[in-house]
């Protein structure tokens, strides 16, 4: 039986990951780019559908992203991820995550564990901080917010009764107005916590193979294996 875990983005541990299994909707890999009508949005040249589709095309070809995670009460943490269709690799201080399309693998150096699981869509979203950039459905109310010059900010609020983002009150995505590239993702939780991902660089990821989304035995040979499959 899995123990109860507290919600803690800043720890970036297996405890954090498993707590979020049922908390977040799998926006990363389900449905199409069916965008709900924008409520209260002024007429603008920025095309949200186009921006999301542009990011989707990058992911299909393979993309590498560097970012900084900030949350209340903790120091900023640098991280990077690369995405290739359904597969992804995520690296944060003390933690490495890999998904090869079927098995989710997590190396947690602070807890000295190597965890394997067959993930649900919620699991994948929980482990992929950039899932929120992609594929919101008609179950969201989307509004354009005031934003600094040169950027566009959209707020995504789950429709009442949908319960699509349990634990998350709403989230916001900031785009560069000229390039239409995502620049920042802010998550606002029901309990008042805010977690932000500031994207520094997005570039094509070359030389991706099936081995890019798994770990070599020497990387986890000294760790306790936790197989949840």
Across the structure, where does each feature detected by a protein language model lie?
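An acidic-aromatic
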Residues: 78-127, 195
